[in-house]
Amino acid sequence: MRNPGGPGWASKRPLQKKQNTACLCAQQPARHFVPAPFNSSRQGKNTAQPTEPSLSSVIAPTLFCAFLYLACVTAELPEVSRRMATSGVRSKEGRREHAFVPEPFTGTNLAPSLWLHRFEVIDDLNHWDHATKLRFLKESLKGDALDVYNGLSSQAQGDFSFVKQALLRAFGAPGEAFSEPEEILFANSMGKGYYLKGKVGHVPVRFLVDSGAQVSVVHPALWEEVTDGDLDTLRPFNNVVKVANGAEMKILGVWDTEISLGKTKLKAEFLVANASAEEAIIGTDVLQDHNAVLDFEHRTCTLKGKKFRLLPVGSSLEDEFDLELIEEEEGSSAPEGSH
């Protein structure tokens, strides 16, 4: 993974099984105990051989390898337990667990707005509590940035938003600390969308095509799987997205990527947010960028002269097979009633 913003920015420690030294057992020459009367021997020698040395030659290496294996497993368990207890990162079966550590910030080694954005992304991915977040914040500040922090009152140091504004005032562009974000309403169709089958990178995805959503969103788990948690793939999102009930959506950042629908590839801009159970939602922004034509009557989506089948949300499992017929012949005319 690239280290965004400089060396050591986001240290990821995947929990991987180590090769135990017990594998030495496999390298031991195979020794089979055969009763002495059946052993071949040179002519004129007594063929009767004691069985004890043969048994010990087999048992001793086996016991030694077993001892080494148990010792390695015993030594590994505390380390695994410690990582799992301290990482606090999101995990899914079959995926590696990542622990992200912020890069030190001196005030000049990185744009303050970018460093603060990445720090908040790491906070969300690691699921830090308030005390842990403040502890990592203080430990990450160095040089002039630490001087700014130490110049605050103890009450201000306990308020992340206050520390954030102080750092932006000290090292950011004029007026950066007081910029007013644009507010965007995320009013999706509430279960009335359609699925479109494709890929993001190498990962198969079932996109929810939602003409009622103004922005396109992917779940953080999908972003992490495709990018291996590369924070350099995220850029700050400076606006505010609110859902129908008025709550503010937590946005990790903007992800510029490419989606594949059959052989058709499309550039897409997604907000990375845990907004719903859907792994990816294609909103009107992406649809308009590529002049998509949705025909809900015939359940098709036309993009770049090609039609793709849509599956309504809530359809039976048997209808899932329709998604395999993702792409029709190029040049087929669009059905009447397309809009």
Curated annotation (Swiss-Prot):
Compositional bias per record (Polar residues), positions renumbered to this chain: 38-53
Main enzyme class: hydrolase
Known partners and oligomeric status: Homodimer.
Function: Protease responsible for filaggrin processing, essential for the maintenance of a proper epidermis organization.
PTM info: Undergoes autocleavage which is necessary for activation of the protein.
Pfam families: gag-asp_proteas
Propeptide: 1-188, 325-339
Membrane-crossing residue ranges in chain numbering: 55-75
Family annotation (SUPFAM superfamilies): Acid proteases
Name of the molecule in the record: Retroviral-like aspartic protease 1
Localization, UniProt: Membrane
GO CC annotation: membrane
EC number: 3.4.23.-
Domain Peptidase A2 residue range list: 205-286
Xref: InterPro entries: Aspartic_peptidase_AS (IPR001969), Asprv1 (IPR033539), Peptidase_A2_cat (IPR001995), Peptidase_aspartic_dom_sf (IPR021109)
Induction note: By 12-O-tetradecanoylphorbol-13-acetate (TPA). No TPA-induced expression is seen in mice lacking Fos.
Residue numbers spanned by region Disordered: 34-53
Keywords, comma-separated and alphabetical: Aspartyl protease, Autocatalytic cleavage, Glycoprotein, Hydrolase, Membrane, Protease, Transmembrane, Transmembrane helix
Top-rank taxon, per record: Eukaryota
CDD domains in the record: retropepsin_like
Encoding gene per record: Asprv1
GO biological process, one term: protein processing
Tissue-specific expression: Highly expressed in stratified epithelia in skin, tongue, esophagus, forestomach and vagina. Also expressed in trachea, urinary bladder and thymus. Undetectable in simple epithelia. Within the epidermis, expressed exclusively in the granular layer (at protein level). Levels are elevated in benign skin tumors but are down-regulated in squamous cell carcinomas.
PANTHER family assigned to the protein according to its UniProt record, in alphabetical order: RETROVIRAL-LIKE ASPARTIC PROTEASE 1
